[in-house]
A protein has these predicted regions:
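Nucleotide-activated sugar donor-binding and catalytic core shared by glycosyltransferases
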Residues: 1-247
Length: 247
């Protein structure tokens, strides 16, 4: 959409352009925001902390909030036919893109197997999208992993998250929803090594998770790249489960 706005502005400079969801200038190194000023007349911001970046360049902006934090639950659904009432829930978010699922799902499946070896009172729920539910289900069905459900219904996912004891999530704005539900969590992410090196050269932030970025410190633990492995995830989750006062 930024390219469209730039093209429209080049054709007719008098057309006013309003962009919903600010370009993440706080992620990338300096310089990009000056370019946006040339073809964006107003920006609608999801996060209040973004204002300072656009105010600095005198780009008109308005903070409108994030829709994930404003969604209301619909009618309550009986989850007993999905999750056993005597099981604690750990919600898992392996990403929306197939490339993310392909990379993170095997790691999470191995983590679940490790948990099942030591504990018998947990159910693991993958929060899928309509687009990737089949991909996740097929990969899980090709393993011997137990105590796993894959859910794509938005209302059911929200209620399951609200009942969760813990969450393991790919970095992204879903961490806001997890935080809003007051569910303790850790953030994981992994990409191929070449892409990781490229990103390291381009980005200027220290954290992968939006909550940590906003606060400029690690509030939610992050397991990135080589630390994103079944053993580290298992150790982190078990540590917090055994020390609930830290959650």
């Amino acid at each position: 959409t930024l390219r469209v706005a730039e093209k429209v502005k080049s054709i007719n400079p008098n057309i006013k352009t309003i962009h919903y969801v600010a370009p993440q200038v706080w992620v990338w190194r300096e310089g990009r925001v000056k370019k946006f000023k040339k073809f964006l007349d107003h920006i609608l911001l999801l996060f209040d902390f973004e204002k300072k970046y656009f105010d600095k360049e005198n780009i008109p902006n308005t903070f409108v909030g994030h829709p994930l934090l404003e969604q209301e639950s619909k009618d309550k659904i009986d989850l007993s036919n999905i999750i056993s009432n005597d099981k604690k829930i750990i919600s898992l978010f392996s990403g929306s893109r197939s490339s993310e699922v392909n990379l993170l799902l095997p790691i999470l499946i191995n983590f679940i197997n490790m948990m099942n070896t030591k504990f018998d009172n947990f159910s693991f729920v993958f929060h899928a999208t309509d687009e990737n539910k089949n991909l996740i289900s097929e990969k899980i069905n090709n393993t011997n992993v137990k105590n796993v459900e894959v859910i794509s219904d938005e209302n059911i996912k929200k209620q399951i998250l609200n009942k969760s004891t813990f969450a393991v999530s790919k970095s992204g704005t879903v961490s806001l929803e997890i935080c809003n539900a007051k569910v303790p969590s850790i953030i994981i992410y992994k990409m191929n090594f070449l892409n990781f090196l490229i990103v390291k050269m381009l980005v200027k932030i220290k954290f992968a998770n939006i909550i940590n970025i906003i606060n400029n410190k690690e509030i939610i633990p992050e397991l990135i790249q080589k630390e994103c492995n079944p053993k580290e995830i298992y150790n982190s989750v078990v540590y917090f489960l055994k020390n609930p006062e830290l959650m």
